[in-house]
Structure formats: C-alpha cells, structure tokens
C-alpha cells in the first residue's frame, strides 16, 4: 500500500514538472517578460512578496472574506433546501430568486453591491450569491432522490428522524453534495477575487492584482495567481476532508425505533371490515371481512397476482382503501417483497436501526447468517442473505402485528427450515400473517391456519 502511495506522489510530481516545462517553453517562445514570465521569475517575485507584512495581510484578508461568503452560502443553502423539501410552498417562493441568481452575471451583482455597500464586504456577498443557488438546488434534488421504498420502510418501523437522515437521506445526498461543493469551491475563489479586483478593498489579493496590472508587474501577477491556487486547493482539501468524515460516520442508534412494550403478551385482534381497494376502475379486492387473532400464524392462500401485497399495504396504512376499515392494532412491522435494506450499511447496522442495540442485533442475526456476512455492506450479500436480514428486522421490531410478504424467496431448503423455525420461535402472542407461494414446511405448517377469503382478488 505504501508503495502505491509513493508511486501516486511520484506521478503527480512528474505531471507538475511537465506543466512547469510547458510554462517555461511558452515564456521562452514569447520572450517578453511583460507578457509571460518564467517560473523562476514568478518564484523570485513570490519570495520577495512573502517578506512583506502587506502580503500576509492581503492573503489572509481575502481568505477570510471568501471563506465567510462560502460558509454563509453553504449553511443557508442546506437549511433552506431542507425547508423547501418539507414545505412545497417554500420551494415555490424561492424559485424566482434561484432563477435570478443563475441568470444575472456576477459582474452585475458586483457593480450593484459596490454602489450599495462599498468594497469591504463585496467579496463576501459575491461568494454567497455564487455558492448559495448551486448548493441549494443540488441539495434539494438529492433530498428528492431519496429512495421512496426506504422511506416507507422507515415510516412502518417508526425510525427516528436522526436515523432516517443518516441512513436514508445522507446516502442519497452524497453524489449531489460532492458535485455541488466541488463546483462551488472553485467558483467562489474565482468570483471572490474578481469582486476584489473590481472593488479593490484594503488588504486583499484582488487589490494587489489590480496594482500589479497598473504597474505592469507581470511577475507579481503570476506570484499572486500561485497564491490563489494554493489557498484554493488547501481550502478545498480541508472542506472535502470534513465531508468525507461526515459521510463515513455511522452514529449509533441508541434507542429502539419501536419500543418492545408494544408487543405485549396480551393477545390482540386485527379487525378487517368490508375492505376494498381498486386501481382506476378495477377492484383489486373487495368485501374482505376477517378477524386475525394473536398467537397463531395465518397464511394467505390466494392465487398469484390476487392482491396480497396491496392487502398488506392497506393493513399497515401505506395504502388507503376505497372501502372499509382496519382496526384493533396500533403497530405493524413488515417484511416487504423487496428487501428494502440500507444497502451501504451492514446487516448489523440495518437491524440496529430498529433495535437500538448493535450487540443484540449481532447476536440475533448470527442465528440465520454466517459470521463473516454480518459486517459486510448489504449490497455485497446474496439475495437469500438479504431476505433473512429483512425477515429478522420484521420479527424483532416489537410490533403487535407482523406481515411477511414472500419471506422464503431465495432460500434453499436448509435455510428455509431455519427461517421457519425462527418465525415459530419468535411469533409469541403476536398476530403473524404470511403471504407466500412456497408452502411452509411441517415445522411451521403445524401452527398455520390456511385462509381462503371468498371473492379475494375477484371483486366487482
């Protein structure tokens, strides 16, 4: 690994030497120090400047203005993007301002602000106006791109806002924020220094560039350009280091999302009264009447495509039925047809989000998964392993009613038997309803009441 790092630095050094050579050749071809100076002449000018107090005052004066403008723009953009995501009216109110910021040239803003405020805070304002719309729009787009299925899962399992943000919204935001910050960091330095050249405030790089232009001091101009590049690169490295730490951080989930007391020993009854659901003019099911009692699993015994998944969604509140009602139960947990796991995180972390205890999550998952799979990102697990993780999450959540939609998909005979034994062991006095095309084995079927509902899937 150290060898690869060394090769990487050598490669970068060679690339730097190449561009210095191009610069040197260009200066020799032009042969006019008023137009292009050599790298050595620029270095001499930089060393001369570095010995002056004014140089450091100008460098740090510009640095704090540009950093302040960037931070103000970024923080406000992140906050207002979150508000706009939550409240549509906020997005509509801000839309004209975003169009205005994107369409009006920076030079126009610079002249107007110079007239209104003077030059001292011009660079701060210009950096703000460049950074704000870019980060706002990308953040809002990232929030909107969050996986709808994962958000439904979070709603069912009652995940806290903190957990939803870090493990659902944050991965969705990552590509958008990285792109927005990379573009904004470069633009804020270019626009900030340009604003200083226009306003020429005291102790600023822009003011020094303006003086170098007046006195035709090209070497000093190149020296200040090198300073801008160094400051810009260093600032970008610091910001992206902080961003990388933020995206790598996996905060612990310290409290159960759904307190275990909800699954009491008292046997509850789920009442389904004259339930009906349709899409457009077609009834998926209609006139479904049933009571489900705790302590004994039920299996939906209906043909494929008859609406079992939609029925589950109506039971747990993800779909609103056209007719009837569901009552008697406050909390549901669901194993969806899709696994709906946070793919960037391990099986242990996915269960920890619900249980609030990483050690307990590891202990439980070890019953159905091999040890080496527990800490792998879920995207690297096989389909059968993911299915078992989603099964454990549904069974351990502590809900009064557990809905399992195709829990045995992707499982071989041995793992299916383990899953059936686990379901039977964990069912307790809760209501447990399964929808599966794979008939449960003997271990589970001894306690299964097969259910055929008249007209289920054939409503009119």
Give each language-model segment a name:
Residues 359-374:
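Conserved ABC ATPase "signature" region
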Residues 405, 411-412:
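ABC-family nucleotide-binding domains
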Residues 125, 129, 162-195:
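Transmembrane alpha-helices
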Residues 391:
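Hydrophobic anchor residue at the start of the ABC signature
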Residues 344-360:
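Q-loop/switch helix immediately C-terminal to the Walker
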Residues 377-381, 385:
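Conserved ABC ATPase signature
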């Amino acid at each position: 690994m150290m060898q690869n790092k060394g090769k990487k630095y050598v490669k970068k050094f060679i690339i730097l030497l190449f561009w210095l050579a191009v610069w040197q050749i260009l200066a020799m071809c032009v042969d006019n120090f008023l137009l292009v100076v050599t790298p050595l002449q620029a270095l001499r000018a930089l060393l001369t400047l570095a010995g002056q107090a004014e140089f450091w005052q100008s460098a740090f004066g510009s640095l704090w203005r540009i950093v302040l403008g960037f931070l103000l723009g970024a923080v406000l953009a992140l906050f207002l993007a979150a508000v706009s995501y939550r409240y549509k009216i906020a997005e509509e109110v801000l839309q004209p301002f975003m169009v205005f910021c994107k369409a009006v040239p920076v030079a126009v803003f610079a002249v107007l602000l110079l007239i209104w405020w003077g030059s001292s805070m011009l660079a701060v304002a210009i950096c703000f106006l460049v950074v704000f719309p870019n980060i706002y729009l990308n953040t809002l787009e990232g929030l909107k791109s969050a996986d709808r299925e994962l958000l439904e899962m979070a709603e069912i399992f009652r995940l806290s806002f903190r957990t939803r943000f870090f493990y659902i919204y944050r991965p969705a935001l990552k590509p958008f924020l990285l792109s927005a910050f990379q573009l904004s960091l470069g633009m804020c330095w270019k626009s900030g220094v340009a604003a200083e050249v226009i306003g020429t405030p005291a102790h600023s790089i822009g003011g020094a560039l303006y003086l170098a232009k007046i006195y035709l001091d090209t070497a000093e101009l190149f020296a200040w350009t090198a300073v801008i590049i160094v400051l810009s690169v260093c600032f970008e490295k610091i910001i992206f280091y902080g961003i990388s730490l933020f995206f790598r951080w996996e905060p612990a989930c310290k409290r159960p999302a759904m307190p275990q007391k909800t699954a009491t020993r008292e046997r509850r009854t789920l009442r389904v009264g004259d339930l009906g659901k349709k899409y457009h003019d077609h009834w998926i099911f209609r006139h479904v009447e049933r009571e489900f009692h705790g302590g004994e699993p039920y299996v939906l015994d209906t043909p494929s495509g008859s609406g079992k998944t939609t029925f589950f969604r109506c039971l747990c509140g993800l779909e609103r039925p056209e007719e009837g009602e569901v009552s008697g139960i406050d909390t549901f947990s669901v194993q969806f047809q899709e696994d709906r796991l946070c793919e960037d995180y391990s099986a242990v972390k996915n269960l920890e989000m619900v249980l609030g205890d990483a050690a307990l999550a590891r202990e439980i998952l070890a019953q159905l998964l091999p040890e080496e799979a527990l800490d792998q990102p879920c995207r690297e697990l096989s389909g059968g392993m993911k299915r078992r993780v989603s099964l454990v999450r549904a069974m351990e959540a502590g809900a009064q009613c557990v809905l399992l939609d195709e829990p045995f998909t992707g499982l071989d005979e041995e793992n299916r038997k383990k899953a059936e034994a686990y379901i039977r062991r964990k069912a307790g006095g809760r209501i447990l309803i399964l929808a599966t095309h794979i008939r449960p084995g003997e271990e589970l079927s001894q306690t299964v009441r097969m259910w055929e509902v008249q007209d289920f899937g054939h409503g009119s």
